[in-house]
């Protein structure tokens, strides 16, 4: 049985002082021994968040990282910088990074490899646009994203990663993929991993659904056979996140 993982993506929200306040507010609400709880916070708040989360079941993740360890990359953050302060997870390839910062599948792959090299668990995002869904190419599109993201990743490494399926048309729009749509794509992702690495790895890897997850939609989504939790956006900034974590 795969352990559920529910991660909050705070995006560009909350100052360091606001981060402390929110984590203190959420600590008692997200207690759940059966779920891995992760807060992915802005880079400037990572150290503060790690300190605030001490003694709780909350792990802290970054929202992005670069694929080099040092050098003339103004504004970027290296994986060894993240591990040095105790970061455990990193979101890679979020649709907003792809859209606003021109991240390609190849860039995503480089970041995945470097995160794994440094012992950081990557939360690898994939998803389709509304146009791609309407064209009926959702599965083909996502399979392509997965295959490139996992280039040169070993089966042992792949089993430790997290994949987040985020239909782009459902992010921050209030629209949610139906439970059937979400399960269909997550199942297809697991099949793709099985083709790349075999059934054992496919059954080990955890797949999240991300896209306007709410306390109301979480119970049905998270009880699907191939959905192992969620990558939660706006709702992770509210007390409602506690209800999502304790969805049962």
Curated annotation (Swiss-Prot):
CDD domains: TIM. The keyword Glycosyltransferase does not apply. Keywords: Cytoplasm, Gluconeogenesis, Glycolysis, Isomerase. It comes from the Bacteria. GO terms for molecular function: triose-phosphate isomerase activity. Its EC number is 5.3.1.1. Signal peptide: none annotated. The active site is at residues 94, 166. Pathway: Carbohydrate biosynthesis; gluconeogenesis; Carbohydrate degradation; glycolysis; D-glyceraldehyde 3-phosphate from glycerone phosphate: step 1/1. Substrate binds at residues 9-11, 172, 212, 233-234. SUPFAM superfamilies: Triosephosphate isomerase (TIM) (SSF51351). One of its GO terms (cellular component) is cytosol. It catalyses: D-glyceraldehyde 3-phosphate = dihydroxyacetone phosphate. It is found in: Cytoplasm. GO terms for biological process: gluconeogenesis; glyceraldehyde-3-phosphate biosynthetic process; glycerol catabolic process; glycolytic process. Belongs to the triosephosphate isomerase family. Involved in the gluconeogenesis. Catalyzes stereospecifically the conversion of dihydroxyacetone phosphate (DHAP) to D-glyceraldehyde-3-phosphate (G3P). Homodimer. This is Triosephosphate isomerase.
């Amino acid at each position: 049985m795969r352990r559920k993982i529910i991660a909050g993506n705070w995006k560009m929200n909350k100052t360091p002082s606001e981060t402390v306040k929110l984590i203190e507010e959420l600590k008692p609400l997200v207690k759940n021994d059966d779920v891995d709880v992760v807060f992915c916070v802005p880079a400037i708040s990572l150290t503060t968040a790690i300190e605030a989360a001490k003694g709780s079941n909350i792990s802290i993740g970054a929202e992005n990282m670069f694929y080099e360890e040092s050098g003339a990359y103004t504004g970027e953050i290296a994986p060894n910088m993240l591990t040095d302060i105790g970061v455990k997870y990193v979101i890679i390839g979020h649709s907003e990074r792809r859209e606003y910062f021109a991240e390609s599948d190849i860039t995503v792959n480089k970041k995945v490899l470097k995160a794994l090299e440094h012992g950081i668990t990557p939360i690898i995002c994939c998803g389709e646009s509304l146009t791609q869904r309407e064209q009926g190419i959702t599965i083909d599109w996502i399979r392509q994203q997965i295959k490139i993201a996992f280039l040169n990743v070993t089966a042992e490494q792949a089993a430790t990663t997290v994949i987040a399926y985020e239909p782009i048309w459902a992010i921050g729009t209030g629209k949610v993929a139906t439970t059937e749509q979400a399960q269909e794509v997550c199942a297809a992702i697991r099949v793709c991993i099985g083709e790349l690495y075999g059934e054992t790895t496919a059954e080990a890897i955890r797949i999240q659904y991300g896209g306007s997850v709410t306390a109301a939609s979480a119970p049905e989504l998270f009880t699907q056979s191939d959905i192992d939790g969620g990558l939660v956006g706006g709702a992770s900034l509210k007390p409602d996140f506690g209800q999502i974590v304790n969805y049962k």
